[in-house]
């Protein structure tokens, strides 16, 4: 898999922080602030790692992941949830388990995040 990451988060500070971290690691970064923009980029051919926030307006991360699956856009991506919501919604996570690589809570440990993304990018 290419060293590409799409960060889907409505918090501009998170988008900037993650961009700085992963550009130093040699990744190509795409940042979008909504689920619909994520789907748009996937339809345009994005392939790589997706770090998906859950709590976003209009279309939350769960709905975005469901829409990605429904449209058949998950073939060339690995999705990881990156959220401030400390405890996962186990019922929703169970339904998406085969399509979600990891559940990472904010604030995140930078070294662990870089390591996890490295594993996902190697898939």
Question: Model-derived features: where do they sit?
Answer:
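Active-site beta3 strand of CheY-like receiver
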Residues: 46-51
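Conserved phosphotransfer cores of two-component systems
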Residues: 43-45, 69-76, 98
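Receiver (REC) domain active-site loop signature in two-component systems and cognate sites
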Residues: 56
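Helix N-cap/capping motif at the beta->alpha junctions
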Residues: 31-40, 61-63
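Charged docking surfaces used in two-component/phosphorelay signaling
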Residues: 16-24
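Active-site residues of response regulator receiver
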Residues: 53, 83
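A Lys-centered signature of the CheY-like receiver
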Residues: 106
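Alpha4 helix (beta4-alpha4-beta5 surface) of REC/receiver domains from two-component response regulators
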Residues: 63, 86-103, 111, 115, ...
